[in-house]
A protein has these predicted regions:
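Acidic, S/T/G-rich, low-cysteine, solvent-exposed domains in lumenal/extracellular/periplasmic regions
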Residues: 1-238
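Alpha-helical transmembrane segments
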Residues: 272-284
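C-terminal target-recognition/interaction regions appended to catalytic cores
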Residues: 199, 266-270
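Short, charged juxtamembrane terminal tails flanking transmembrane helices
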Residues: 286-288
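Residue-level signal for secondary-structure boundary elements
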Residues: 237-241, 273
Length: 288
C-alpha cells in the first residue's frame, strides 16, 4: 500500500457479490480468491473489460496454490487464452532456486512494458507459483504473451506444507520443462478510424510475487517490474518510482522461526499489493 500511494495510485475495494464495478474504473484486481466466482460475478468482470464495446480496461488476476477448484474463473480466463495449471513451479537445477526448489527467480523476462525498470535484466522472485499457461498465440482477435518464464530445467509439482514446522514437501513432477510465472491475454478491436483498442488480462501465478515482503527486497525488481507493466498497459506517464524501505542481505539465510513466518505468508495468504492507475477496484468475493 505505501508503495502504491507514494506512486500516485488509489485503491478501492468492491464486494463483487453485492456491488457493481464503477464505470470509471481503469483496473480491476482479483487477488488470489480462495473460492470460485459465481456466474453473475464473472459477468460483472467480463462486462467491465468489454466496456460497452470500447475495451480499454485492465484486469490483474492473481492465482494461489491454496485455491479450491475455480471452474467459472477458469472458463473466463480461457476466453483470453489463459489457464492456471496444477501444482507449483519448481527448479531441478540447484543453481536456479534458493533454499527450496519452489522458491525461484524468473529466467526470462519479456521486454514488454519494462520502461520503468532500472536494470536491463530484472530479477523477479517467486515462491509457490502456479504455472500460467497460454492456450493459443492468436485466435478471434485475442492474443497471448508469456511475460515471465522459468528455465528449461523447471517442472511443476504438488506441495505439502507442514502446519507445525513449515517444512515444504515436494511431490513427483507433473509437467517438466519451461513454465510461465505470468502471462497476458489481450482482446483487440479495430475502430473505424484505423485505431486498435485493447483490454488485457494479466494472470500471475502467485500472490507471493506481490507480497509486501518480496516487494521490499533490494536484490529483486518485483516492485519496479509490476508497476512498470501496469503503467505500460494503462498508458500512465512514467515518473520517479518510489520504492518502500528495502531489505538487503541474503534473503535465504533464514532461521526456523522465519521459515514458519514464510509458511504463513505463502500458505495462508498475504495482503496483496494492488497495482492501479486512476481508479482501481480490488474485487473481492465475500465467502458465504
Amino acid at each position: 500500500q505505501p508503495l502504491l500511494t507514494a506512486n500516485g495510485y488509489n485503491v478501492n475495494t468492491v464486494d463483487i457479490t453485492s456491488e457493481d464495478i464503477p464505470a470509471d474504473t481503469d483496473v480491476v484486481v482479483i487477488p488470489a480468491p480462495k473460492t470460485d466466482y459465481l456466474e453473475e460475478d464473472i459477468k460483472k468482470v467480463s462486462d467491465f473489460l468489454n466496456n460497452g464495446g470500447n475495451l480499454g480496461k485492465q484486469l490483474l488476476y492473481i492465482a494461489s496454490y491454496g485455491q479450491e477448484d475455480t471452474p467459472n474463473l477458469d472458463e473466463f480466463l480461457s476466453e483470453y487464452g489463459l489457464s492456471v495449471g496444477k501444482g507449483v513451479i519448481c527448479e531441478s537445477d540447484s543453481g536456479k532456486y534458493y533454499n527450496s526448489p519452489c522458491i525461484t527467480v524468473a529466467s526470462t523476462v519479456s521486454d514488454n512494458f519494462t520502461q520503468d525498470v532500472s536494470t536491463e535484466k530484472p530479477a523477479i522472485l517467486s515462491a509457490l507459483c502456479r504455472p500460467v499457461n497460454t492456450l493459443f498465440d492468436e485466435q478471434d482477435m485475442v492474443s497471448t504473451d508469456a511475460y515471465l518464464k522459468s528455465s528449461d530445467s523447471a517442472y511443476t509439482a504438488n506441495v505439502d506444507i507442514s502446519q507445525t514446522t513449515g517444512q515444504v514437501n515436494i511431490g513427483d513432477a507433473l509437467v517438466k520443462g519451461q513454465q510461465n510465472y505470468m502471462a497476458v491475454g489481450s482482446k483487440a478491436k479495430f475502430t473505424d478510424d484505423n485505431k486498435t483498442l485493447y483490454s488485457n488480462v494479466i494472470a500471475v501465478g502467485s500472490e507471493g510475487m506481490l507480497s509486501d515482503t518480496y516487494l521490499q527486497y533490494s536484490q529483486y525488481q518485483n516492485s519496479e517490474y509490476f508497476i512498470s507493466v501496469i503503467n505500460g498497459l494503462t498508458g500512465k506517464t512514467a515518473g520517479i518510482t518510489i520504492t518502500p524501505k528495502t531489505i538487503t542481505g541474503n534473503v535465504f539465510d533464514i532461521t526456523q522461526q522465519q521459515k514458519t513466518v514464510l509458511k504463513w505468508t505463502f500458505c495462508l495468504g498475504v495482503p496483496v499489493v494492488v497495482l492501479i492507475v486512476g481508479i482501481v477496484i480490488w474485487a473481492r468475493r465475500k465467502n458465504k
